[in-house]
């Protein structure tokens, strides 16, 4: 992360609005949570570990003065997904946007070495979780003419080594998002995708496990560094969910520092 980044000023575009963020208590998801909170949004944040969610709630509420509702859920379990949506909407009254960020996978494992369990981990935590959250959030988003921002990855766009199950889940999310954009457009609900390349706890672990691949990745980024989760990823999610992007739907935005250059 570049320590010389300029100070960012926020416009409170989401003051009085309510946003659901999966995996919003840590990593890139925490950066997204901070970005929406800085714009005045009240949040429903989900994850598997209550202590991390409660810590994020305390810190976000203290810094930004918004309300945060933490709810534990396994995104791959449809019944559990219903809980954060119902609980959050009950406390916050409405839902204006959903950001599906959470994902688990067996990275660094070649396709021929992948097990069904490896694939299930990626598909259930990513593709199924995104499907379940979209499906059950839609009735509320329809009422507010809301927006969905889903997370995919350069792993699928560019065929990254050792990422077959992760790429499969993420490309499934991209395809599903485009279909949803077509189906939900008449109801005023927009659906877009971001493919981030951001520094996070998971990436730091990957750096430790695969230092040579990490250095090769850094060298392939024209801007020379990974994104800041809040400023570089979260603020784009805010834009896509805001009125400024009211005519943007079904799109994939690559946030790769130039490493995702395409014709």
Task: Report each predicted region and the residues it spans.
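Short C-terminal tail/terminal secondary-structure segment
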Residues: 9, 108, 158, 219, ...
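Conserved glycine-rich cofactor-binding loop
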Residues: 18, 25-27
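Substrate-binding pocket helix/loop in short-chain dehydrogenase/reductase
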Residues: 109-111, 115-123, 217
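Active-site helix of classical SDR
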Residues: 134, 169, 177
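Residue(s) in the substrate-gating loop at a strand-loop-helix junction
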Residues: 153
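Short, small/polar-rich loop/turn modules that mediate ligand/substrate recognition or access, typified
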Residues: 185, 190, 248-250
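Catalytic Tyr-x(3-8)-Lys segment
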Residues: 212-231
């Amino acid at each position: 992360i570049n320590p010389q980044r300029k100070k960012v000023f926020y416009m409170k575009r989401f003051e009085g609005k309510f946003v659901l963020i999966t995996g919003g208590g840590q990593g890139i998801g925490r950066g997204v949570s901070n970005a929406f909170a800085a714009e005045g949004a009240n949040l429903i944040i989900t994850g598997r570990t209550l202590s991390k969610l409660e810590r994020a709630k305390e810190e976000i509420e203290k810094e930004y003065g918004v309300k945060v509702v933490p709810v534990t859920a396994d995104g791959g379990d449809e019944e559990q997904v219903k809980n954060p949506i119902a609980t959050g909407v009950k406390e916050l009254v409405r839902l204006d946007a959903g950001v599906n960020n959470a994902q688990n996978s067996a990275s660094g494992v070649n396709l021929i070495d992948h097990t069904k369990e490896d694939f299930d981990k990626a598909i259930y935590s990513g593709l199924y979780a995104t499907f379940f959250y979209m499906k059950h959030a839609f009735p509320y988003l329809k009422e507010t003419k809301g927006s969905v921002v889903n997370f995919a990855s350069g792993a699928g766009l560019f065929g990254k080594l050792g990422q077959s199950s992760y790429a499969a889940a993420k490309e499934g999310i991209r395809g599903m998002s485009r279909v949803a954009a077509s189906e939900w457009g008449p109801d005023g609900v927009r659906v877009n995708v971001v493919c981030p390349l951001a520094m996070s706890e998971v990436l730091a672990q990957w750096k430790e496990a695969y230092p040579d691949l990490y250095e090769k990745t850094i060298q392939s980024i024209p801007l020379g560094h990974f994104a800041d989760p809040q400023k570089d990823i979260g603020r784009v999610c805010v834009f896509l969910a805001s009125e400024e992007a009211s005519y943007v739907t079904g799109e994939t935005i690559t946030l790769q520092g130039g490493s995702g250059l395409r014709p």
